[in-house]
């Protein structure tokens, strides 16, 4: 076969970079393209309930496998996906957004086509996406199309940001040389400038050598930009106390003897706050300093000796080194840092949160107890997904087993995100290891935005655990403003009827209202095996919330009220 269609070329390239499931919806401008996915063995078209959920699913898949792809149709389809794409941009997640667009001739003639604004402007939606994309491409020439596809795939992966790729309907059936597939896409990072890199490393080593009370703080981009292994080795070699931010949950092993807890500024446990803020050197890996990630910007370091490791630059104290990538800096540091740190005398890390005290089995379930107890149910390798709201804050109180994947959307915070993200993560987990468990915690309010995607989970035989926290409405909003306001109320649903309503045949449902019911269920051997999809409704008091969320809500309300 000397030639293949451009559409097939796209899917072959995606398969080569380990993207095996593609998300999205069919539309008349992408139908011919979608035909080609079935020509590539090992590729799967998920077929979502709507484009927003598809974007969320692509985000969840990419967080596990490194990048993903969503395909939508021109105008109506692509715009429905943009909230999800914006979230991926904000949170550094590599999603390739492929849009089937009208033929080149139709665009040239400015035909008054459906799905347009009726003004002959076929570039308007492309322009809308540009500000939430690392780069964009609109294919117009079949001769350069393969190179453009390769560039878009590489950029998606390397930058961990969304990329927009427009494919006109008349080009996807045209042929390109098949031999192009024999040359893999270069997915490697370009080397750092040697002189700048040496200056950075020498400066860090000098700071490490002088430090008496250093700490390591792992944040979101530690996971997103693939330096988890380097960060773990950094902890092993130096024995510095290591902490995570809320967005960094899962980026380092929380069973490591040098793990000290979650740092969230003033919302941290007092001993964690003191340990981090009294440090004389902070090695901050992959920081994303958003309000909910920092306790409303309440970091209060006593030292100026802060080293920030970023994907595309380094910052040491007040000096910034553009273009110096943390991946290479960390790799080179690991060859010499043990010697620089040999004078360090390890200090004790903050004690782990003690186990819950024994209570009568009839005790009503509350969030503080539940999140602390959850660690007993989790297993090494689990994917734990926490929805914006009480779940995203409560999960900070749970100590993860090693090699746990943590997914939340602390920065973008689009409620309902995690239903779609769970679908994407479940596809990714199945491709890695069918026994890998995917566990969702979502509020009853958030679920109502994106519940349709449960039907896609059922369609594909995926087996996540769906924990629905039923506290009768939008609790996080109630805590911020309007505790009794009608706009924070929702219609109650019969959650345990949802799985059969969506057509599930092999499933389980449970309702848990007491500590005894929680322990009995989570300790059950068969329940711990991900043999079927499960929905577990957790009955909670209306205003019950993790204490750190209560405090964050006060800070957010104060910020909103400032003139």
Curated annotation (Swiss-Prot):
Residues annotated with Phosphothreonine modification: 266, 336, 353, 522
Modification Omega-N-methylarginine, positions: 161
Biological process, per Gene Ontology: aromatic amino acid family catabolic process to alcohol via Ehrlich pathway; branched-chain amino acid catabolic process; glycolytic fermentation to ethanol; L-phenylalanine catabolic process; L-tryptophan catabolic process
Nucleus among keywords: yes
Keywords: Acetylation, Allosteric enzyme, Branched-chain amino acid catabolism, Cytoplasm, Decarboxylase, Isopeptide bond, Lyase, Magnesium, Metal-binding, Methylation, Nucleus, Phenylalanine catabolism, Phosphoprotein, Thiamine pyrophosphate, Tryptophan catabolism, Ubl conjugation
Record-level GO cellular component terms: cytoplasm; cytosol; nucleus
Summary of the protein's practical applications: Fusel oils and acyloins are important flavor and aroma compounds in yeast-fermented products contributing to the quality of beverages and food, e.g. fusel oils in whiskey, contrary to common believe, seem to alleviate hangover. In general they are desirable at low concentrations, whereas high concentrations may spoil the product. By adjusting growth conditions and substrate their production is sought to be influenced. Due to their broad substrate tolerance pyruvate decarboxylases are important biocatalysts for chemoenzymatic syntheses, both by fermentation and in vitro, e.g.
Associated pathway: Fermentation; ethanol fermentation; Amino-acid degradation; Ehrlich pathway
Induction or repression: Protein expression is strongly induced by high concentrations of fermentable carbon sources and under anaerobic growth conditions and is repressed by ethanol. Protein expression level is also autoregulated through an unknown mechanism.
EC number: 4.1.1.-, 4.1.1.43, 4.1.1.72, 4.1.1.74
InterPro entries referenced in this protein's UniProt entry, alphabetically: DHS-like_NAD/FAD-binding_dom, PDC/IPDC-like, THDP-binding, Thiamin_PyroP_enz_cen_dom, Thiamin_PyroP_enz_TPP-bd_dom, TPP-bd_CS, TPP_enzyme_TPP-bd, TPP_PDC_IPDC
Role summary: Major of three pyruvate decarboxylases (PDC1, PDC5, PDC6) implicated in the nonoxidative conversion of pyruvate to acetaldehyde and carbon dioxide during alcoholic fermentation. Most of the produced acetaldehyde is subsequently reduced to ethanol, but some is required for cytosolic acetyl-CoA production for biosynthetic pathways. The enzyme is also one of five 2-oxo acid decarboxylases (PDC1, PDC5, PDC6, ARO10, and THI3) able to decarboxylate more complex 2-oxo acids (alpha-ketoacids) than pyruvate, which seem mainly involved in amino acid catabolism.
Family: Belongs to the TPP enzyme family.
Name of protein: Pyruvate decarboxylase isozyme 1
Species whose genome carries this gene: Saccharomyces cerevisiae (strain ATCC 204508 / S288c)
Classification lineage: Eukaryota, Fungi, Dikarya, Ascomycota, Saccharomycotina
């Amino acid at each position: 076969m000397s030639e293949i269609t451009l559409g097939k070329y796209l899917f072959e390239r995606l398969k080569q970079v380990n993207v095996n499931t593609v998300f999205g919806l069919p539309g008349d401008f992408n139908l011919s393209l979608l035909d080609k996915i079935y020509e590539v063995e090992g590729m799967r078209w998920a077929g979502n309930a709507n484009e927003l959920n598809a974007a969320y699913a692509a985000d969840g898949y990419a967080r596990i496998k490194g990048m993903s792809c969503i395909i939508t149709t021109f105008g109506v389809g692509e715009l429905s996906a943009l909230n999800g794409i914006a979230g991926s941009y904000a949170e550094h997640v590599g999603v390739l957004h492929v849009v089937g667009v009208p033929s080149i001739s139709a665009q040239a003639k400015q035909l008054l086509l459906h799905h347009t604004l009726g003004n002959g402007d076929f570039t308007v939606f492309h322009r809308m996406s540009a500000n939430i994309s690392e780069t964009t491409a609109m294919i117009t020439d079949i001769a350069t199309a393969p190179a453009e596809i390769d560039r878009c795939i590489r950029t998606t992966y390397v930058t961990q940001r969304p990329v927009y790729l427009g494919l006109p309907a008349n080009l996807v059936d045209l042929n390109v040389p098949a031999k192009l597939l024999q040359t893999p896409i270069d997915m490697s990072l370009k080397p750092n400038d040697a002189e700048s890199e040496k200056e950075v490393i020498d400066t860090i080593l000098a700071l490490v050598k002088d430090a008496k009370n250093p700490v390591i703080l792992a944040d979101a981009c530690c996971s997103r930009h693939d330096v988890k292994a380097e960060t773990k080795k950094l902890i092993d070699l130096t024995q510095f106390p290591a902490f995570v931010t809320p967005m960094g949950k899962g980026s380092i092993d929380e069973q490591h003897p040098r793990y000290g807890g979650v740092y969230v500024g003033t919302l941290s446990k007092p001993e964690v706050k003191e340990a981090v803020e009294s440090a004389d050197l902070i090695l901050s890996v992959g920081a994303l300093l958003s309000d909910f990630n920092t306790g409303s910007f309440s970091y209060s370091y006593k030292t100026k000796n802060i080293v920030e490791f970023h994907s595309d630059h380094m910052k040491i104290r007040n000096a910034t080194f553009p273009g110096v990538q943390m991946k290479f800096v960390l790799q080179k540091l690991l060859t010499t840092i043990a010697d620089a740190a040999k004078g360090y005398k390890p200090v004790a890390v903050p004690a782990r949160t003690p186990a819950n005290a024994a209570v009568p089995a009839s005790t009503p379930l509350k969030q503080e107890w539940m999140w602390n107890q959850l660690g007993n149910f989790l297993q090494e390798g689990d994917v734990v997904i926490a929805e914006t709201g009480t779940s995203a804050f409560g999960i900070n109180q749970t100590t993860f087993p090693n090699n746990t994947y943590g997914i939340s959307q602390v920065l973008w915070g689009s409620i309902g995100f995690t239903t779609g993200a769970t679908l994407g993560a479940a596809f990714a987990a199945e491709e890695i290891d069918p026994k890998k468990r995917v566990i969702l915690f979502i509020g009853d309010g958030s679920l109502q935005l994106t519940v349709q995607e449960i039907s896609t989970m059922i369609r594909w035989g995926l087996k996540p655990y769906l924990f629905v926290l039923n506290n009768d409405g939008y609790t996080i909003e109630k805590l911020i403003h309007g505790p009794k306001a009608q706009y924070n109320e929702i219609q109650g649903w019969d959650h345990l009827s949802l799985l059969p309503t969506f057509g599930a045949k092999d499933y389980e449902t449970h309702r848990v209202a007491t500590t005894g019911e929680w322990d009995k269920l989570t300790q059950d051997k068969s329940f711990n095996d991900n043999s079927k999809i499960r929905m577990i409704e957790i009955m909670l008091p209306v205003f019950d919330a993790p204490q750190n969320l209560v405090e964050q809500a006060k800070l957010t309300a104060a910020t909103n009220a400032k003139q």
